[in-house]
Amino acid sequence: MSKVIKFVKKEAVLFISLAAALISMIFTPPNPEYLGYVDWSTLGLLFCLMAAVQGFGSIGAFSRLAGTLTRRFHSTRSLGAALVLMCFFLAMLVTNDVSLLTLVPLTIALFRSLPEICIRTVVLETAAANLGSMATPMGNPQNLYIYSHFSMPVADFFRVTLPPTALSLALLLLSVLLIPRSKLSAPESPENAADVPAGASGKRMKLRAALFSAAAAVSLCTVLRLLDWRVCLVVVLVCVLTADWRVLKRVDYALLLTFICFFVFVGNLSAVPAVRELISGVVSGREMLVGVLLSQVISNVPCAVMLSGFTGNAEQLLLGVDIGGLGTLIASLASLISFKLYGASAGAKKARYFAEFSAYNFAMLIVLFAAQTGFNALSA
């Protein structure tokens, strides 16, 4: 029973989305149209990207890159700034979740004896991962979903995301100046360093790296709409199964199931004319504001899926759920990853972490939302 309770707590968003889907079935009983609710191309592409990224993680690629870069810095501020910026840019390519899973354990190990610096750096890394991930379609699940669901042209996507991303980078560059400066002591090994199989031959590792690179390249081509997602799925499965089938166990299937539950929930609500008109009336013309506010309560990935069924304004919805990833601890599930990693470390000061997290996140949220609101007004 304790294992079940632990699993439910760990996957709370999945079970909330499942409950929402089941309740919505009261209004629209199960029928064959349910299959049409699900955006299979988005789910397939998301699976492919996660499998490719987890493949690189399984051979220690990200940990080695992070370790190589961090050895070049000798003060807490310069190292902290480097880690924050690494999170920002890495998230654009491998998602906000993966950048945090790679760099937060390293940060905790490096700053274990400096609790104030550790907290501030992890808080800023979390903000950096969420903000950097907004720049690209594959940076986070909500971006990939909106980009795919609304068939956004690549140029339009970057036109929307690059200005707030640039402002976010400026905010982060100012924020890292608040990391105290002191001399670094010798770092300890990260607790959660990636597993590289003992005794793995150089030739075998190179083959695995090549196969995971091929999977990533095919996934990127699919993001750019150069390949059909079904072709991508087959190629990625062949590459991963050939390289290391255990990588498939690392894929976040709970996230995929969460998407399916919300697809059913939104589809069922949309099938009821009165409900569809009511929600559409609230969302229409306020996509960014509603996206920001709703993300604070249910997190930005479910928010993107839910609101997409009631608006055609992909650009403002995209801005709302990306900027809305700042704020509360649950606004972005990636933020919970950092909190769990830090909270599990020796001597963790969770109350201090929560206070700093809230202060930095809400400050950045207010600045970005105000700036984007002003930009929208000028562009109208």
Residues covered by each model-derived region:
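Transmembrane helical segments that form the transport core of multi-pass membrane transport proteins
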Residues: Y37, I59, S63-A66, S213-G312
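Structural signal for alpha-helical transmembrane segments and their membrane-water exit/capping regions
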Residues: S2-E33, G44-G60, L178-R181, V218-R246, ...
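Juxtamembrane and boundary regions of transmembrane helices in multi-pass small-molecule transporters
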Residues: S2, E116, A155-K203, L336-A380
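Cytoplasmic-side transmembrane-helix entry/capping segments in multi-pass membrane proteins
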Residues: V13-L14, W40-S41, G67-A81, I119-A127, ...
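N-terminal membrane topogenic signal
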Residues: M1-I16, S75-T76, S201-L211
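Interfacial loop-to-helix junctions that mark the boundaries of transmembrane helices
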Residues: V4-K10, P32-T42, M152-P164, S201-R204, ...
